[in-house]
């Protein structure tokens, strides 16, 4: 079970997430929609530089141009990129040619069962998928605080050949159930881990990581017994 804390906006929050047991942090750079989590590339670079060992900084971007994304990857020094845009297969192939060793995660919004058909062409060019919730009313494509239909996500996990990360309204209170229902490769939370000032709350992060790991091992043990 891999755990990502997204929407990191301070060095101290990145360090805290690492010490709480997160495997990755998300740095949201390259804005096209509404979000409180966007930071500029210079702050992202600083956070990447000061990340502790054994944690992966992920560039989360809404840009869809391969050249622009490549520029951000180069300048920030991230090892993974998460695409929240209408990137084409060809754009991802182009990005891969420039950075052959980078991990590429493609976002899809779970708006109905048909989403799996949109995902299929990307299976051969990405390293993983992330499933999130769309909030058109507030012009948000991520960090919406809204859950989607986990039964669809569960079906996607079974039918695609790439690892699937679950996002969308996850909190310390519901992450265990989400893992039991969906059985994803990883989970990703942002808004559900914030304090009243919009930064990451340490106790929420601790509880999220603990419950995610705990319920994953319960699911894993059951599968091994069967």
Curated annotation (Swiss-Prot):
EC number: 5.3.1.24
Keywords: Amino-acid biosynthesis, Aromatic amino acid biosynthesis, Isomerase, Tryptophan biosynthesis
Keyword Isomerase: yes
GO biological process: L-tryptophan biosynthetic process
Annotated CDD domains: PRAI (cd00405)
Keyword Magnesium appears in the UniProt entry: no
Catalytic activity: N-(5-phospho-beta-D-ribosyl)anthranilate = 1-(2-carboxyphenylamino)-1-deoxy-D-ribulose 5-phosphate
PANTHER family per UniProt: N-(5'-PHOSPHORIBOSYL)ANTHRANILATE ISOMERASE
Family: Belongs to the TrpF family.
Protein name: N-(5'-phosphoribosyl)anthranilate isomerase 2
Name of the encoding gene: trpF2
